[in-house]
Amino acid sequence: LHPVKRFRPIASRKVTPTTALILMFLLDGAGAAGFNLIQTSGNQIWLSSGGYILLNLAYTLFLKQVQIIDAMIVACGFIIRLEAGAVAGDIELSHWLIIMTFILSLFLAFAKRRDDLRNFMETGQISRKNITGYTIDYLNVILSFLSSIIAVTYILYTLSPEVTSRSSEYLYVTVPFVLAGIMRYMQIILVEKSNCNPTDILLKDRTLQLTVVGWFIVFALLIY
């Protein structure tokens, strides 16, 4: 069993699968019905919710066993949630935001695969059946590749006409924070060989925390 995920409600048997399914459909239905009452985006919310449920079912039943595809499905799930949130808030999404969300989600998904593989190599406990289809070297290359794409995409985003016209033409000054954050994260997992769970790292690493806070402050000052 996964050293962390085994404590989740369903995995730890605190919530039965039947109860979880009932709660899922009740909450999903209540949310979509609520949007039907307050605005006309209810049908789109239903489509997003239905698509997300089907995607998760396909992932749970068989796609999570397929290397590479499993991580891409996780990233697609984030895009569906992003689209649903935009519909609910009546916000027009920028194609830059969609692209960066997908690539960042893909990066984090592969980072977790690397963490699972490292745990398997150290303890012999396999928490994900398809993890044997990966190697540390391969995942290091993938993470380096995706981190480069994230950096380039963010730079292009800050320089794009639609962003400079609506926000600030000086948004590019936030680029060093993004680069520093990426390089620090890669240093943690490749040099320090630490746990590469993004949540754990962000909660514990002061350098990364300062980088995120610095980016947020400068970004907010520039657009407001």
Where are these regions (language model features)?
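Alpha-helical transmembrane segments
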Residues: 91-110, 166-179
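Interfacial loop-to-transmembrane junctions
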Residues: 186-213
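Cytoplasmic-side transmembrane-helix entry/capping segments in multi-pass membrane proteins
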Residues: 67-77, 202-208
